[in-house]
């Protein structure tokens, strides 16, 4: 399952790069991978693009964060992880401004200033701690909030892989999730609020579409594509 998550996450990250920087010329992805989205509407980098349509065979019936495919899809569009992998597979700070360790036991992450949730609230180190503890994502670590912009992951044993694990760690806003008792049934629109380049707009189950819009205050600048529509297909025969 983790391998599939990484593949789908990579696919969505590639699409996100196209959306933010707008690939040159019109192009269409005709890959036959069952969960790989097909993209139409990519365009000239010099223009602001109104809409990009993505076709996918992902199985999405709910906007719950516990819905696997929705988490992969929206998480890549709507959230920034602390760490990302570049096109060469090298680890780079993302929502974090920097990260370091001296012994592979205590990892310190300095968050970028100015990152906000889509409702305007600031993203803080407390959100990182809250999410990790809520989901029990890192059971072998104690999460320490040093200040609003600094968080530590502390373990009794060495682990050089922690930054890799954080690439797929989607942080949640504590001010929204602190009173949620069941993540699986929490499907309020606020459940999809993130801190990334796109805001979740709506899920039309009858039409089989999800809509996202560019976040005006995204810390790395508003994406070149104003709106992304994800259209769900039953199989690859109807997708292409």
PLM regions with names:
Residues 148, 229-240:
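Short helix-initiation/N-cap motifs at beta->coil->alpha
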Residues 97-136, 146, 152:
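Aromatic- and charge-enriched surface segment that lines or borders ligand/interaction sites
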Residues 48-61, 106-110, 128, 151-153, ...:
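Short, well-ordered beta-strand elements
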Residues 86, 90, 168-223, 227, ...:
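Gly/Pro-rich hinge or "lid" segments in bacterial periplasmic/extracellular proteins
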Residues 100, 137-180, 197, 204:
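Surface-exposed binding/hinge segments that line
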Residues 45-48, 60-67, 90-92, 161-164, ...:
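Short, solvent-exposed loop/turn elements at domain surfaces
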Residues 55-102, 193:
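N-terminal lobe/hinge region of extracytoplasmic solute-binding protein
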Residues 1-52, 90, 136, 142, ...:
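Short, low-complexity disordered leader/linker segments with a strong preference
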């Amino acid at each position: 399952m983790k391998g599939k998550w990484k593949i789908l996450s990579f696919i969505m990250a590639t699409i996100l790069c196209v959306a933010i920087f707008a690939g040159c010329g019109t192009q269409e992805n005709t890959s036959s991978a069952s969960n790989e989205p097909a993209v139409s509407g990519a365009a000239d980098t010099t223009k602001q693009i109104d809409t990009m349509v993505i076709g996918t065979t992902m199985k999405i019936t709910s906007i719950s964060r516990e819905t696997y495919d929705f988490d992969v899809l929206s998480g890549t569009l709507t959230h920034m992880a602390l760490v990302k992998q570049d096109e060469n597979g090298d680890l780079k700070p993302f929502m974090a401004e920097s990260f370091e360790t001296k012994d592979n036991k205590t990892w310190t992450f300095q968050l970028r200033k100015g990152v906000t949730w889509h409702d305007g609230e600031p993203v803080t180190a407390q959100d990182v701690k809250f999410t990790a503890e809520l989901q029990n994502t890192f059971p072998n670590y104690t999460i320490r909030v040093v200040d609003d912009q600094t968080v530590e992951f502390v373990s009794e044993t060495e682990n050089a892989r922690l930054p890799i694990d954080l690439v797929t760690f989607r942080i949640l806003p504590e001010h929204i999730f602190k009173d949620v008792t069941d993540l699986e049934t929490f499907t309020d629109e606020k459940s999809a609020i993130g801190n990334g380049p796109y805001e979740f707009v709506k899920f039309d189950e009858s039409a089989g579409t999800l809509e996202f819009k560019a976040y005006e205050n995204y810390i790395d600048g508003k994406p070149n594509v104003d709106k992304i529509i994800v259209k769900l297909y039953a199989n690859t025969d109807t997708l292409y």
